[in-house]
């Protein structure tokens, strides 16, 4: 599939220039990100498995809120992406002073956004859930409101952690965020087990350990950022710098708008599924968990893509940009083929881990089969390649494509197949594949055109 990107570009580096990244440096960057993504998805699966013991109303309530939670997380991730791109570009241009300044601005913006969003979600938890999902069963609604209000308390700390982790990725040191993520997830899993099985806390038992783990993670990442021997020197006194903040937000806001509308679209299609009852909601939740495993390598490599391409763009080297983009895409195809192949091979056993009824289990198997089979072909070019464009400041194009593809293809076909034709969750997942096809076409053509080369200005 990476041959699609080949258009008047050579696949190796010429001219005697020294490569910006060695094979070892790419692995040192990508492998910890892979482990971190694996930990994140594993904890999500553990949360779902544990709360499933509290009944299908509880798992449905938590899964519905997790869609809102994902919407919030992508806002923080988009801001972190903006900061990581800017820092990487300054490092590529060997401008250490502005790299330090942009690092401080990222942490400041992350903390402020986390506090505002956390307060809004805590106060408006019930109206938000009603707005997104309409008429859902009362016990599912109550479980969702309780979960959202507790988890909202962690948003400021999650935003700070994401910002700090992005800084370490931008300097090629993803090992730090991996280590902290490991500790955060251990706290989460142990806390869940104690609270759910020991204290019988139900939904509360899933939420509170997440809050504690994120507080600890934020404290540790900030401590690392302010160490005297750190590669980046983050200013100890942070004041808003309009010019630098604008540069970060110039990438972060389009990415946030794009990703938040994408997640909002996912929430809308889940609201369509929710009209078919608890069986469909629960099957969709479990399928999302398992499919998260399949895209772990792709997500890790997409994060690495930001650092690598950002550094190449900052150095003004378009040849190396193309070279490393194709190289990382090849890695994504190989690793996602292995991960999704394994899921398909052991699918029934994996779904059997969850406490599901027979009907729910069979539906979950069908949904995972659709996702895993198609992700091997479409996912890398749909979601890894656009990060190369973002790192080159071509954020408006990726935003427009993502929004239009979501609105026209995923939402449009979800309504047609899920609601009008009565396919339920299966219709939504088929519409997802149609959406991916559109993204692949647009992003490949954009990269081949070379239009992204004109977007970055030092």
Model-derived segments and spans:
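Residue-level hotspots within the lipid-embedded alpha helices of multi-pass solute transporters
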Residues: 37-38, 74, 114, 118, ...
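Helix-terminus/linker motif at the lipid-water interface of multi-pass membrane proteins
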Residues: 38-60, 129-138, 194-201, 260-293, ...
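N-terminal transmembrane alpha-helices
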Residues: 17-49, 53-54, 70-82, 86, ...
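Transmembrane helical elements of multi-pass membrane transporters/channels
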Residues: 28-47, 150, 184, 213-217, ...
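Small-residue hotspots at the loop-to-helix junctions and early N-terminal turns
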Residues: 56-67, 144, 148, 207, ...
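Short alpha-helical transmembrane segments in multi-pass integral membrane proteins
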Residues: 1-30, 87-154, 196-253, 309-375, ...
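Short runs within selected transmembrane alpha-helices of multi-pass transporters and secretion channels
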Residues: 80, 150-169, 177-188, 206-221, ...
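Small-residue-rich hydrophobic transmembrane alpha-helices
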Residues: 59-119, 158-177, 270, 281-347, ...
């Amino acid at each position: 599939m990476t041959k699609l990107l080949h258009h008047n570009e050579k696949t190796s580096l010429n001219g005697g220039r020294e490569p910006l990244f060695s094979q070892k440096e790419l692995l040192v960057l990508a492998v910890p990100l892979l482990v971190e993504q694996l930990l994140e998805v594993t904890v999500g699966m553990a949360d779902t498995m544990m709360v499933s013991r509290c009944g299908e109303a509880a798992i449905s309530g938590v899964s519905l809120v997790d869609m809102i939670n994902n919407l919030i997380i992508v806002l923080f991730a988009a801001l972190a992406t903006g900061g990581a791109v800017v820092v990487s570009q300054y490092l590529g241009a060997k401008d250490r002073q502005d790299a330090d300044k942009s690092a401080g601005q990222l942490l400041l913006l992350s903390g402020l956004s986390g506090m505002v969003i956390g307060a809004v979600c805590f106060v408006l938890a019930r109206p938000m859930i009603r707005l997104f999902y309409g008429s859902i069963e009362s016990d599912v609604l109550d479980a969702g409101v309780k979960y959202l209000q507790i988890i909202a308390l962690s948003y400021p700390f999650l935003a700070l952690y994401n910002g700090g982790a992005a800084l370490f990725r931008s300097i090629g040191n993803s090992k730090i965020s991996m280590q902290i993520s490991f500790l955060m997830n251990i706290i989460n899993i142990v806390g869940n087990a104690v609270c759910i099985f020991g204290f019988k806390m139900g939904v509360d038992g899933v939420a509170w350990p997440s809050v504690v783990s994120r507080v600890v993670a934020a404290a540790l990442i900030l401590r690392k950022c302010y160490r005297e021997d750190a590669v980046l020197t983050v200013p100890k006194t942070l004041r808003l710098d309009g010019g630098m903040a604008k540069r970060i937000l110039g990438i972060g806001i389009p990415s946030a708008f794009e990703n938040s509308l994408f997640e909002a679209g996912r929430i809308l299609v889940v609201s369509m599924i929710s009209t078919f009852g608890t069986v469909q909601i629960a099957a969709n939740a479990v399928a999302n968990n398992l499919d998260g495993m399949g895209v772990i390598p792709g997500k890790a490599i997409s994060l690495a893509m930001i650092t690598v391409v950002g550094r190449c763009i900052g150095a003004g080297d378009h040849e190396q940009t193309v070279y490393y983009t194709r190289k990382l895409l090849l890695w994504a195809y190989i690793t996602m083929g292995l991960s999704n192949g394994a899921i398909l091979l052991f699918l029934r056993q994996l779904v059997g881990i969850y406490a599901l009824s027979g009907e729910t289990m069979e539906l979950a198997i069908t949904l995972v089969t659709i996702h895993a089979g198609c992700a091997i072909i479409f996912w890398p070019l749909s979601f890894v390649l656009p990060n190369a464009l973002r790192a080159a400041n071509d954020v408006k194009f990726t935003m427009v494509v993502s929004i239009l593809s979501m609105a026209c293809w995923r939402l449009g076909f979800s309504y047609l197949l899920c609601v009008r034709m009565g396919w339920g969750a299966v219709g939504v997942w088929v519409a997802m594949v149609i959406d991916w096809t559109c993204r692949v076409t647009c992003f490949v053509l954009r990269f081949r055109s070379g239009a992204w080369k004109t977007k970055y200005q030092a």
